[in-house]
From Swiss-Prot:
Family: Belongs to the ALY1 family.
Subunit (UniProt): Interacts with RSP5.
Nucleus is among the record's keywords: no
Listed Basic and acidic residues bias regions: 593-610
Protein name, as recorded: Arrestin-related trafficking adapter 6
Free-text function comment from the UniProt entry: May regulate endocytosis by recruiting RSP5 ubiquitin ligase activity to specific plasma membrane proteins in response to extracellular stimuli.
Post-translational modification Phosphoserine, affected residues: 220
Coiled coil: none
Keyword Phosphoprotein: yes
């Protein structure tokens, strides 16, 4: 059972979801004793930095070094401390004098030094004194299970109990498996830490008794462990960290005693039980750091140092180191790979030559394409073509401890990479060397006719990383104290006959070139090619076999460093070399000139060498001095390979049909009837598309809805009484005070209510029923202020309250305001809003059947034209004849308007305008 340590902090994953966090069963420990083993597993075994130009490196995001320290405890053990240190050291050697009086000086500089103190037994947060350890000690600390207690005391991120047999498949130890099994709330991550802990945070730490890491995933040293000398990289690294957690039952005091033993200083020391304790770490590496360098008089090395201190006078501290390789890549904006070096010149009006070097940079253990074109202008002989590579190393250090800089240049190294000679002359003087240029013929002659013609040559020059066991080619560096520069040099040996004598000339063409580490191939610098990992289907819909897709797109024209002939040669055959992510740093090379192919003991090896010799005997590769024995297939990919094919998108490619296209003037209707797969004549409607997608639109039955009515929430007045007093209100308008001008909304005195007495067939769908509030003018403001927002019609005049602008307040959800949608509504009897008469208000044919209460007869429809007096316009088409029991809508509206002070505002404004 796996146990995790988590806190509710910022999450940052340390391992990719597909990688295992634990060591493989067959992994070799860095160091082991009879009681424990130590492993270090890195998420990326190589750290890549970008950019060779010093300007702009600070703007590039730092690279990340992440991994886990695995302490496998075989027997119960007591440890004092567990820590891991990431350290980078630059060293420049300066030998002077001649032996035996030779003196050697060295300039050592620390590039980076960062420590993760995962566990510290002397820390009070990891040990309890005997006086605090009592029978009720379990009640003084938080509730946790037995495994959680191990995590808290050990400071580990993950604890894996020992098993009788190692798991056959480690895939279940990946973070992806953790997420699928719901064993963790987040990805494996560190917990950030700051040197300043707030008061509230200190209380939380005191309650949880959780140790704080420096920049580790689950450290066990408090934040002030480093004091004021906290590394500046610690805080950056802490931003990426968090841990796992689990909660469980509280162990009994007897169980707690199994993990604590008293020591000499009256403290209880935690005992590490058998199992795997995984400590995860993460550290950003700035792009300005130098890459790993190993030269003759200088070096830059990065190492992870693991220190485990044990209790006991006769038990030594366990110390081991793991080297970290840092490689520098060109920046993302670099175009040197795609820029060619082109030289076009005439030599003494005798020969015109064009030289094209396809790239300004080359990867070690790869091939550089170079093309030549020669056009003779006179009788001239070209005996030989040679291609060299030169390397110069420059060292800088402080002179005698002062700030003065001392420079030292190492002798320039010159390596012959390729050579193309003319044919051997038939008559050579005895004792002369046949390999000399003067004993070679003219390579510009036609092989059949023997005439002097234009010639083109194409070479694929192999650039090895190692020539002998002691001579290596170092990539370009960006470090100011150790600089490596490279030049490519092309030499042409020509001769011209003057009379009886022949004079020889040497043309030298030099150009700077960047040499990159072999890991800087396209397989590590370009994004994955998803098209090359499609699952192709045949015409029957069957997927292509995986064996056919394994080598798909293994060659691409953009991958100029690995020619197609080499990719198909046995040096890249899967039967020769096994796929392995851990790429060897050195590749053996075999000298190809003046050496015969030795017989192999094995027939298979002999057959492979014969096939390889045939490949390198081609015109493009025969001139190479060195050839590779084997090349990792991972480096030859034109783009990076997806790390997780399971989580990558699987795209299906359907091949095109072989059937011919239809005629230009074919009948689509007839073709559609005959062919069920043809395009229909009419495009599908919107509802057809939704139906095909399985989406159903909601159906609304309009006949089952009822329109709400507007009613006044005061005592009812008959329309007759309103009619009698309608024009009497005009004389009282001038007597009203102006103190109510701030609240003159005609709609603020209404609310939505239902009329249960009048049937829905007599109600216009757009004109709700109104009833007067019948408020006195003196108490109108006081009563309005006490109205609830949910019972007042939304205001449109002089109202800034947000509660009056919600449509949900108009149609309340209470039983009094709700109306059943199941009631039927006759749409045939609905009339336009401007067509209002007595027949609409009340029908004579069925009035006796639906009106039982005389008060119900006062309900009438309200029209938007009710504010206009019909006497003002002679062209009015409305019928305003009202019986005794009915009131004129205009008079009713005027009374309402008078109570709301609308006309008062109008008259006041009109008088002020006349003045």
């Amino acid at each position: 059972m796996l146990q995790f340590n988590t806190e509710n902090d910022t999450v940052a994953p340390v391992f990719p979801m597909e990688q295992d966090i634990n060591a493989a069963p067959d992994a070799v420990p860095l160091v082991q004793t009879t009681t424990l083993q130590v492993f270090v597993k890195l998420a990326e075994p190589i750290v890549f930095l970008k950019g060779f130009e010093t300007n702009g490196l600070s703007e590039i995001a730092p690279s990340i070094l992440r991994g886990s320290l695995i302490v496998r405890v075989l027997k119960p053990n007591k440890l004092k401390s567990i820590s891991i240190t990431f350290k980078g050291i630059s060293r420049t050697e300066w030998p002077e004098g001649i032996p035996p009086k030779r003196e050697e000086f060295s300039d050592v500089e620390t590039v980076v030094n960062h420590t993760w103190p995962f566990y510290q037994a002397d820390d009070g947060m990891n040990s309890f004194t005997l006086e605090h350890h009592s029978s009720n000690n379990s009640s003084n600390r938080p509730s946790m299970s037995d495994e959680d207690y191990l995590l808290e005391k050990s400071g580990a991120s993950v604890y894996i109990p020992p098993t009788a047999e190692p798991p056959k498949d480690n895939s279940n130890l990946s973070l992806d498996a953790y997420e699928r099994n719901s064993l963790s709330s987040d990805n494996l991550s560190n917990k950030p830490v700051s040197s300043d802990v707030s008061h509230d945070d200190s209380k939380l730490l005191a309650i949880q008794k959780t140790p704080l890491p420096s920049s580790s995933r689950r450290g066990s040293v408090p934040a002030n462990f480093h004091g004021n000398s906290l590394s500046p990289h610690t805080f950056i690294s802490d931003l990426f960290t968090k841990t796992f957690s689990n909660s469980g039952a509280t162990p009994s005091p007897e169980q707690e005693d199994n993990y604590l033993t008293p020591s000499k200083d009256s403290k209880e020391v935690f005992i590490f039980r058998p199992g795997d304790y995984i400590y995860t770490f993460e550290q950003p590496i700035s792009q300005s750091y130098p890459e790993s360098i190993k030269a003759n008089f200088g070096s830059v090395e990065y190492k992870l140092s693991i220190d485990i201190e044990r209790f006991g006078a006769f038990k030594s501290t366990i110390h081991t180191q793991l080297p970290i390789k840092v490689v520098r890549l060109p920046s993302d904006g670099s175009v040197e790979e795609t820029e060619a070096i082109a030289i076009s010149k005439d030599w003494k009006d005798l020969l015109h030559y064009d030289v094209v070097i396809f790239s300004k940079e080359i990867v070690l253990n790869a091939f550089l394409p170079i093309d030549f074109h020669f056009a003779p202008l006179d009788k001239v002989t070209l005996h030989r073509i040679r291609i060299y590579l030169t390397e110069s190393m420059e060292y800088t250090c402080n002179s005698n401890g002062n700030h003065e800089k001392a420079r030292r240049l190492e002798p320039t190294k010159k390596f012959l990479l390729a050579e193309h000679n003319g044919p051997k002359l038939p008559h050579i003087p005895a004792g002369s060397n046949p390999l000399k240029a003067k004993n070679r013929g003219n390579i510009l002659l036609d092989e059949k006719s023997g005439d002097l013609v234009n010639k083109d040559f194409q070479f694929e020059v192999f650039v090895p990383s190692k020539f002998t066991n002691s001579i290596r080619l170092h990539p370009d560096t960006n470090y100011d104290k150790i600089k490596a520069h490279h030049w490519i040099k092309i030499c042409l040996r020509l001769s011209k006959k003057y009379g009886d004598n022949r004079k020889h000339f040497e043309i030298s063409i030099d150009s700077p070139i960047h040499i990159l580490n072999q890991l800087c191939s396209h397989a590590n610098t370009l994004l994955p090619s998803y098209e090359s990992h499609f699952q192709y289907c045949d015409e029957d819909g069957n997927f292509a076999p995986a064996a056919d897709q394994q080598n798909y797109a293994s060659h691409h024209d953009s991958n100029i460093f690995f020619p197609k002939e080499v990719l198909s040669s046995p040096v890249l055959s899967p039967n020769v070399q096994k796929m392995n992510i851990r790429i060897p740093s050195d590749l053996p090379v075999v000298r190809n000139r003046a050496e015969s192919v030795k017989k192999s003991k094995s027939d298979n090896t002999s057959k492979k060498n014969d096939q390889s010799s045939n490949v390198f005997a081609s015109k493009q590769l025969v001139a190479n001095i060195y050839k590779p024995n084997q090349i990792p297939r991972e480096l030859t990919s034109p783009q990076a390979l997806p790390l997780s094919p399971i989580t990558s998108p699987i795209l299906n490619y359907q091949p095109l049909s072989n059937s011919p296209p239809p005629d230009f003037d074919f009948d689509l209707a007839k073709r559609g009837a005959a062919d069920s797969h043809a395009i229909p004549v009419d495009p599908p409607s919107y509802f057809d598309v939704l139906k095909a997608d399985g989406i159903e639109l909601p159906y609304y039955d309009t006949s089952s809805s009822k329109i709400p009515e507007l009613k006044l929430n005061k005592s009812r007045e008959t329309l007759a009484s309103i009619e009698e007093d309608s024009f009497n209100g005009w004389s009282q308008i001038d007597d009203l005070s102006d103190e109510d001008d701030n609240d003159g909304d005609i709609a603020s005195g209404f609310n939505f209510k239902l009329s249960t007495s009048a049937p829905s067939e007599n109600v216009n769908s757009h004109t709700p029923i109104l009833q007067s509030l019948n408020m006195s003018l003196d108490g109108r403001k006081k009563n309005r202020a006490s109205l609830h927002a949910t019972s007042v019609l939304p205001s449109t005049i002089r109202q800034n309250n947000q509660h009056f602008n919600d449509i949900n307040q108009m149609l309340g959800s209470s039983d009094e305001d709700a109306f059943p949608k199941s009631q039927s509504l006759n749409f045939n009897k609905k009339l336009p809003i401007l067509k209002i008469n007595d027949n609409v208000i009340q029908s004579n044919s069925n009035s006796n059947n639906r009106v039982d209460n005389p008060e119900d007869t006062v309900d009438s429809s309200v029209d938007i034209t009710a504010f206009y007096d019909p006497r003002m316009s002679s062209d009015s088409k409305f019928d305003w004849e009202v019986s005794k029991n009915h009131v004129d809508p205009a008079a009713y509206s005027v009374n309402v308007a008078s109570e709301n002070r609308v006309l008062d505002d109008f008259k006041k404004a009109f008088r002020e305008k006349r003045k």
